[in-house]
Regions:
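Surface-exposed polar/charged interaction patches
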Residues: 2, 13-16, 73, 77, ...
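Polybasic, proline/glycine-rich intrinsically disordered low-complexity segments
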Residues: 211-267
Length: 267
């Protein structure tokens, strides 16, 4: 789950030579070039030959609606052995990715201030590139719309202590690590923003670093949840059509509900 870490950026547009698009409105920002080197090293060390992929500049809304429908239909299955295995693998692989980033000299710090730590994606990328630092929201402070239950903590390895600390010695859950590594690899490699197209890029980049079963859990936590938020039932009218900006019933990114939390595997 990355719900509290996502800063919604509205009206994503492509940067062109004719028009300088301000930070916060860009589809792609200036990336952190070292991110690609760290990602390639991680994959090479694990014989991961998944191709790099290409930047995504537009989103297929029909496909995103279908993904949202799949997420909506998923049954929360925390006791399913395959689901347990997938989430455990995802947690372990996320920890290994976190270690790779830390070994390269970067730091993560839990944000306890008011509002958002960054006004837009470029500010986050600049912090990573210039200061080797990233703020994240604590999972304990925000896990969807509700607090973590003890039952969820026992069932889901992502909600357990990872053994890592932030730069101030605060405990990091595996899901805290995921919020960090997902924004690090998913957003700073291509420089993509946080809107729907940016999140599709983040999933596309970062999912390639996981093994197949772990990737399915990771996809549930990213592409599945994001598609539900942006293209799910809350964004449709009585006819099932997507409500466009300016139409009655449209919800701005900050008004949208978080996706319901589920331990399940996207196809």
């Amino acid at each position: 789950d990355e719900s509290e870490q996502t800063v919604s950026e509205i009206d994503e547009v492509t940067v062109t030579e004719e028009k300088v698009v301000p930070a916060g409105k860009r589809l792609f920002n200036n990336p952190n070039t070292e991110t690609t080197e760290i990602s390639k090293k991680y994959k090479k060390d694990r014989n991961n030959e998944t191709p790099e992929g290409e930047p995504i500049t537009s989103i297929d809304t029909e496909n995103s609606r279908d993904i949202a429908d799949v997420y909506e239909s998923l049954e929360d299955s925390p006791n399913d052995p395959k689901v347990q295995e997938a989430y455990s693998l995802m947690a372990d692989e996320t920890a290994a990715q976190h270690q790779e980033i830390i070994d390269a000299g970067y730091e993560v710090e839990i944000w306890n201030g008011e509002g958002e730590p960054y006004a837009n994606a470029q500010e986050m990328i600049d912090d990573v590139r210039d200061n080797k630092h990233m703020w994240i929201y604590s999972t304990e402070a925000g896990f969807g719309d509700t607090a973590i239950t003890e039952e969820q903590r026992q069932q889901n390895k992502l909600l357990q202590d990872s053994g890592f600390k932030d730069k101030n010695g605060n405990t990091l859950l595996y899901n805290d690590l995921f919020r960090f590594v997902h924004d690090f690899f998913g957003h700073t490699e291509r420089g993509n923003g946080f809107g729907p197209v940016g999140e599709e890029n983040a999933w596309d980049v970062h999912s390639r670093m996981y093994t197949p079963l772990a990737r399915r859990a990771m996809t549930t936590e990213t592409r599945g949840q994001n598609s539900w938020v942006n293209f799910g039932p809350q964004m449709r009218n009585d006819k099932g059509e997507l409500i466009k900006k300016g139409e009655e019933g449209y919800l701005s990114p900050r008004e949208r509900a978080f996706a319901p939390q589920k331990m399940a595997l996207m196809p």
